[in-house]
Amino acid sequence: MAVQQWADALKKAKKTALISDGKRKVHYQFEDGNEMAEEYDLKTDELVMRKWRHKTTFGGQGQWTLEVGETNPTGATSDLIKENSSNPLFMRRDTKTSFQWRIRNISYPLEVYSVTAEPMERCCVIRTSNKKYYKKFSIPDLERCQLPLESTALSFTHANNTLIISYKKPKEILTLEQELLGELKKLKGTSEGDIDCKTQ
């Protein structure tokens, strides 16, 4: 089963851990050369950020792509042209039991939204009846484990100009995450500033 293959890939990956800013930061180097970086909140053990870097066609290092977490609005390009801050902002932020997406700066009433799972296309689709917003997105965690997309696991709500979409994690994912978290806690993570300095 693909869940076991992904679990094995995670176990075989070379892992480095660092504890900093109240987060456990873990870097994975996979056998195929791809890299994954994750950050977990130390108090809640929730995944705060996950990003990937895949090898390029010519074997070089590609750019980091964010899978979970919020993009940093103040980057190196802050002086250049940037999109309007009132545009809808799509991001993923997971909880212990659900995959969760938030779309900020979207102010229509709840009845305007339609969120559906498309099992044949293996994606979820957000539509508005006023045709002002449309978005397709997949769930990479389900793709990696080759688990089916269930429309009954999908729900959504709207508050404070933010549409919140939740997808209940399948039991296979919950079990895998618990096992992985147990292994990560066993990793000897260094803290910032914990560098061996020999006194003279």
Curated annotation (Swiss-Prot):
Pfam families hit by this protein: DPCD
Domain of life: Eukaryota
The family this protein is said to belong to: Belongs to the DPCD family.
Protein's name in the database: Protein DPCD
Organism this protein belongs to: Danio rerio
Lineage: Eukaryota, Metazoa, Chordata, Craniata, Vertebrata
